[in-house]
Amino acid sequence: NMVEFLIQEKHYPSALMSNEITVEINQMKKRCDTIVYDVNCQPFVIIEYKAPEVPITQKVFDQIASYNLKLNVPILIVSNGLTHYCCRIDYAQRRYIFFKEIPDYSIFKQYKNEQ
């Protein structure tokens, strides 16, 4: 599963990961699949999972972006188990910068202060 992959292979700290977190957006309760927190317990990465038969489309990115309106994280990850997308948000330039693969957690630390 994706959470185990992130912990075992990409060194995401399990103690800083929470699953199925409720976020209120426009007075509606939504559920983030996984949020990874920084060492100060602030949301840092949002992860959205889809089933393998569900293609990763703009609609999926719109979904995770809506969660980010509330959480304001620098990193977004979307996966259907077969295809993974990971991007950092450049808030100054108002754009997404995609990684070729999901980076090791240690790489993300440099982006925390860019929000």
Located regions from the model:
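A short, conserved, highly charged catalytic patch centered on acidic carboxylates
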Residues: 1-75, 82-115
